Amino acid sequence: MQVGSYKGEISIFRRENIIIGIGEHGKQVNLGADDKNGIWIALELLRTEPILKVVLFPGEEIGCVGSNSCSMDFFNDAKFVIQCDRRNGHDFIHTAGCVTLCDSSFPSPQLKQKYGYVNTTGLMTDVQTLKKRGLNVACCNLSCGYYNPHLDTEYTDVGELINCLQFVREIVQTVEHTPHEYTAPSYPLLGSWSGYRAHNPQEPEIDWEDWNDDYYANWYSHYYKRY
């Protein structure tokens, strides 16, 4: 198999709560946990939650190819949409790329606190794309326990992965239909420039890893539309 730049078989090792991948050369390699962790959560929930349906989009990291081209009719009966494709174990992405994905009441602050999730912002991802295409229910992107995505030092924290699974399961079992209409973001110029912090004056710090992913994904998508 191929994960990242490594070609070959990967052996999985677990020590306490940490999972890493070791290549045939005996060195640590990328697990592909971004976003195998999210896929695992989705498949596990299909075992226990018959009301659930799942969509797996290709090409998220090169411009949200799948979510940009899917039929939105798939979501006509959705109560809400949850994506599990965020590193670490505590981020609840309620705004992505200046697009508001849900209100603060989804789900309740008490439920977020129970599982240790904290509201924060992100950039380009599938739920943001769906929202921009007219998704009219609440959505979010959740941390699911992977760290150092795209690098050979990537690893998974199993405890955080399972915590995300349990969080999503409780949302599915307890939260009702949650309407939320898309509102186009505004980008006011602050001063003589219009960078990320100008668009988000309250944002405490720039997430450069997400910023770079977003920049190169959009460049890649634009390049291949041209040629």
Spans of features found by a protein language model:
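Acidic/His- and Gly-rich active-site-bordering loop/insert found
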Residues: 1-21
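Short, acidic Gly/Pro/Ser/Thr-rich loop/turn segments
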Residues: 2-4, 62, 89-91, 147-149
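Generic recognition of long tandem-repeat/solenoid scaffolds
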Residues: 17-31
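Acidic/histidine-rich catalytic neighborhood of metal-dependent amide-processing enzymes
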Residues: 27-105, 115, 119, 126-127, ...
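Gly/Ser/Thr-rich active-site loops/lids in small-molecule metabolic enzymes
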Residues: 101-112, 160-168
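Zn-dependent metallopeptidase/amidohydrolase metal-coordination segment
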Residues: 118-164
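His/Asp/Glu-rich mid-to-C-terminal helical/loop segments that flank catalytic regions of hydrolases
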Residues: 148-207, 212
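Long, low-complexity, intrinsically disordered segments
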Residues: 203-227
